A protein has these predicted regions:
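Mature-chain termini and adjacent capping regions
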Residues: 1-381
């Protein structure tokens, strides 16, 4: 009977062998089984109990190894049906992927393995774990096709999505459909329709529209950002956003608009070398510049390259080459080609630098650092 079984297995796939030995990874060891108990045979089917299968490449290196409680071959011996599956994927004799599932099926000479029912795939190289109800494993392509809702877990990141792919060679997870990625420290949540996670590089790329929400330790939202594209470096806590960016902060209550932003979501510091607008809706203050940086924790904004500040409540405008704004106190310091004008009383000042506060129209403009520039009052009715 055992000789007949070996003959049938080799006809199915010369690279698949029955091995009564231990399997590494998903189970630390497999008890030795009496060969006589391994095989039962109906008229048209071969059934293996507590069996181990493995496939090797032309260089005789093990590609994968699978253990199942029961293995039933189809009538033509082209498909193997598996029950209670654990297995490993190898590269250079090292385990690079561990899998387990309630059920499975081996097709296409061992090049396609379908797994179903609480499928768990873990990569010991990076500590990531993916779970789903259905995964297609293609060992020769170094690919997992995740066809149903999935959850990915990493020491500092969790992701969920409708479907995805995991490229085992490069340790990259691509997911799509209702993507949510949550970072634990600092607390950050990303939502998108598509996401690429390069795990060894600790990099996340959202090639489409994305929303980032930052939380404090009390799970209160501090910042919300949207853009057309985003890239995150999880090690540096740095997000790089492109096109149609809007940042809304709750403390202080500001709205930022630009087309490019580098955002340290740990330190809450944003910087850009593109035109930027900062809007304080409560106080009706607007600042625009050709580049700038804002530090929300210190409540300091610095704009350069041609700056315009408007306080609509006080009906005043301030123009400068560079400007620093203390968001809390409304103190401003500006330099270069200063123009300050107000409506009540009507005045216009020019000079090289300016300092003061917007909330009480108290702005001092100087020229060459010493000479006070005289106000020009227009009394024309």
């Amino acid at each position: 009977m055992l000789g007949l079984f070996k003959s049938v297995v080799y006809q199915l796939n010369t690279l698949i062998l029955l091995l009564p030995l231990a399997i590494a990874g998903c189970q630390s060891s497999t008890p030795e089984v009496d060969p006589a108990s391994l095989v039962s045979r109906n008229d048209t089917q071969l059934v293996l109990n507590n069996a181990v299968l493995e496939q090797s490449n032309p260089q005789s290196n093990t590609v994968w190894k699978i253990k199942a409680d029961n293995i039933t071959y189809s009538d033509n011996n082209q498909v193997a049906i598996l029950d209670k599956v654990v297995g490993n994927l190898f590269e250079d004799d090292l385990v690079i992927l561990k899998i387990s599932a309630e059920a499975g099926k081996i097709e296409n000479n061992g090049n396609v393995i379908l797994l179903n029912g609480t499928v768990i795939a873990s990569d010991p190289r990076n500590g990531s774990v993916v779970t789903s109800e259905s995964i297609e494993w293609r060992p020769q392509e170094d690919l997992l096709l995740i066809k149903e809702k999935l959850e990915g877990i990493h020491p500092n990141l969790e992701v969920t999505a409708g479907q995805g792919k995991y490229f085992t060679k490069i340790e990259k997870l691509e997911i799509e459909d209702d993507v949510i990625a949550t970072s634990k420290q600092p607390p950050l949540q990303l939502t998108s329709d598509r996401l690429e996670w390069n795990i060894p590089q600790s990099q996340i790329v959202s090639p489409g529209a994305v929303e980032l929400v930052r939380y404090d330790q009390n799970k209160t939202i501090t910042d919300r950002l949207v853009s057309d594209r985003a890239e995150l470096n999880l090690t540096q806590n740095l997000a790089t956003l492109n096109q149609n960016i809007e940042l809304i902060s709750s403390s202080p209550t500001l709205q930022i608009a630009t087309d490019f932003l580098t955002w340290n979501y740990q330190e809450r510091i944003g910087s850009t070398d593109r035109p930027i607008q900062i809007l304080d809706r409560d106080r009706q203050i607007s600042l625009t510049g050709n580049q700038g940086e804002i530090d929300f924790l210190r409540q300091i904004a610095k704009l350069q390259g041609g700056v315009k500040g408007i306080d609509r409540q006080k009906a005043l405008e301030l123009y400068a080459r560079n400007l620093t704004w203390n968001i809390d106190t409304e103190k401003v310091e500006a330099e270069g080609n200063i123009i300050y004008q107000q409506t009540e009383p009507k005045a216009r000042l020019t000079g090289d630098s300016a300092i003061g506060t917007l909330k009480n129209n108290n702005i001092t403009v100087t020229s060459n650092g010493t000479q006070q520039v005289t106000s020009i009052i227009d009394d024309t009715p």
